[in-house]
Amino acid sequence: MGQEIADNRFSEEDFIAFSERLKRETVLLGEWLRDGAFPRSDHVGGFELEAWLVDEAAEPAPINDRCLEKINSPLVVPELAKFNLELNGHPVTLAGDALSCLANDLKRTWSSCNALADEHGARLAMIGILPTVTEDHLNPQNMSPLKRYKALDEQLFKLRGGKPLSMDIEGRERLSFVHEDVMLESATTSFQIHLKVDVDKAVRFYNAAKLLSAPMVALSANSPYLFGVDLWDETRIPLFEQAVYVGQSELTKRVTFGVRYLEHSIMELFEANCERYPVLLPRLMDEPEERFAHLRLHNGTIWRWNRPLVGFNDQGVPHLRIEHRVVPAGPTVDDCMANAAFYFGAVHALAAMEDPPEGHLPYEQARDNFYNAARLGLHAEVQWLDGRRGGLGVLCEELLYGLARQGLEALGIEPSEIERWLGIVERRLNSGQTGAVWQRGWVAAHGRDMRGLTEAYLERQASGRPVHEWGI
């Protein structure tokens, strides 16, 4: 969840003071990590789901303020655009029936929000990119009235020297256009999977999350169209990267897969934040250094596809989390939770291997795997740990599915839970029908009618049946 700021106007002194506090907090975090200030904990998982509000014409409905007034829940918060909401869940220890607990939590919140949206002639949609969104919807008038969003827009374009964004995405077709504000980011909605990790295992889990980014984005792909143009299976990836591009080097991209694996400590990421990334939101906060307020705010303006997070529980005890951001929203709650189950299991299995698997796949290949998977989905050809090259769908079926099962068993997830959630993944792999495949199939059968596609998608989403069961 984002942090609100008191003002969107900053002086040079604000940037200098913020940078000094950021440096001190970064040094302190390094000391805490070395000195054991982060206690060991159970494996805990959670999520954030970004959703669309959609009107009777199946177009974005900029009414999140009206819905939020009625919802009045800390679990539901605004997003960048007035037509988006963020739904959060209660974190749970990953054992027993944890996956069903997470799913039921999301279903309750989803149902409540949908009922309130209905009072305003709208409904919720979970999808990577809404097919009916147009560039006209992505304008500053539809920006949520929070100062952090206005400040983010101003500071990003200040880093760009005021130059507009030149967008160019080439997939099955090509889309090029120019845009003059940060609102393009709001067209990308995701299901972010959170995992609490111990400090001494953070490097292994982080590198495992990177290895899994290619299969996860292919398995969950749900964003083939932008402005009616057929692009990548998961067009959300290049769109988000280009939407906040500041025109600098690979080392300072604000949305990034990164430049290497971690070697010794999760601190390598926070040190990179401090050393390489210009401050965007220099809000000065009256907080003790031990709360890492400036470090956490700055980290929130760097959108790594796998992002480290520092958090605190209600008793003020610190913890580390890894936020896996590659998965799009939808198509249904059950699809989302099946994706989470696959990730939780596979990342634990990879991180527990005696021989670190990242040592068997060059970083550049892991990066190329990720972008190929986002472009081509389960049909992408990738290289895996044993040097073998092949289709991602085959890799998921023959190797990663078993690893995910092994990891969930080691966590103590109930056998019936494993069968339920990984069974959805297995049947999706067998059918080959991801959200992206279904959307393209519908268009092939019915024509490029984005409203018709969205209505058909929402009808099937409302059934609750996972996407592999959807008919065209």
Language-model-detected regions and their locations in the chain:
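Phosphate/nucleotide-binding catalytic core
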Residues: 1-472
